[in-house]
């Protein structure tokens, strides 16, 4: 996601007090190390240090995974990349020029969605897609909430492809969650996809970073969510069949204990062809 290079890294814009040249060298070194040590079928990096890592992976007729790169081509975060920013004070987040994927990757995704014919269409990417905006407060501008027009373009691509069973896999926010995704079209909320957000394995939770009140804020703002856990660490375990999708949210009581067991905190299911997630 981002920490291979730098926190909330965006394109070629230094995110820390650092020279442009120093940042470019660090970014190139990060992608070289990533290519050398991660089991990905791409590369090697180009002469300028860039590495195309967005790609699709097909599993027969069951599923196609569109693995996106939401860092290398994105616009810089608007409004100082702050947390809990009044929406009225940050109209820049609505600008059409703001991109999460870059024009070339956006078109690649739209073309891939249109051509896809598997039962499940899976968009695997980094940051939370569903809106986390309460009244006038935007929780995190590094997420798709800071790239509203880009999110609408992705939703348009899904709608235009006329695909059912579209699942979005996300992370980054150090919390777990599951929510249906909707687009506003002609005054009507149109179901577009279903998002599963995996929490961090050991990085600080939102509660640890922002305090316990943030849980109530997230639960209020994520009104379409069927599951939210902003405290525990763990991972997601997914089972996919032609008939349905099951995500088990696994949590560990103590990440400092090698012997701590992993338990199922919640199970969320989606029946093929259905429009809503169901928590069991």
Q: Where would I find each of the regions flagged by the language model?
A:
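Metal-dependent phosphoester/phosphodiester hydrolase catalytic core
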Residues: 2-280
């Amino acid at each position: 996601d981002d920490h291979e290079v730098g926190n909330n890294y965006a394109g070629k814009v230094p995110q820390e007090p650092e020279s442009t040249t120093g940042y470019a060298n660090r970014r190139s070194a990060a992608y070289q190390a990533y290519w050398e040590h991660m089991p990905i079928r791409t590369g090697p990096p180009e002469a300028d240090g860039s590495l195309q890592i967005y790609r699709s992976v097909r599993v027969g007729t069951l599923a196609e995974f569109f693995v996106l790169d939401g860092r290398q081509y994105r616009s810089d975060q608007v409004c100082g990349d702050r947390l809990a920013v009044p929406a009225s004070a940050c109209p820049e987040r609505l600008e059409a020029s703001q991109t999460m994927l870059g024009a070339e990757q956006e078109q690649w995704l739209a073309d891939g969605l249109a051509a896809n014919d598997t039962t499940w269409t899976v968009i695997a990417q980094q940051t939370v897609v569903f809106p986390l905006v309460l009244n006038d407060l935007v929780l995190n501008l590094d997420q798709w909430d800071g790239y509203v027009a880009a999110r609408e373009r992705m939703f348009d691509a899904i709608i235009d492809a006329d695909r059912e069973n579209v699942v979005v896999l996300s992370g980054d926010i150090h919390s777990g969650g599951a929510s249906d995704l909707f687009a506003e079209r002609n005054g009507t909320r149109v179901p577009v996809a279903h998002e599963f957000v995996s929490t961090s394995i050991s990085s600080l939770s939102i509660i640890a970073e922002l305090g316990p009140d943030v849980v109530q804020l997230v639960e209020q703002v994520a009104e379409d969510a069927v599951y939210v856990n902003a405290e525990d660490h763990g991972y997601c375990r997914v089972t996919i069949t032609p008939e349905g999708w099951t995500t088990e949210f696994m949590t560990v009581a103590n990440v400092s204990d090698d012997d701590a067991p992993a338990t199922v905190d919640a199970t969320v299911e989606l029946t093929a062809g259905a429009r809503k997630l169901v928590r069991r």
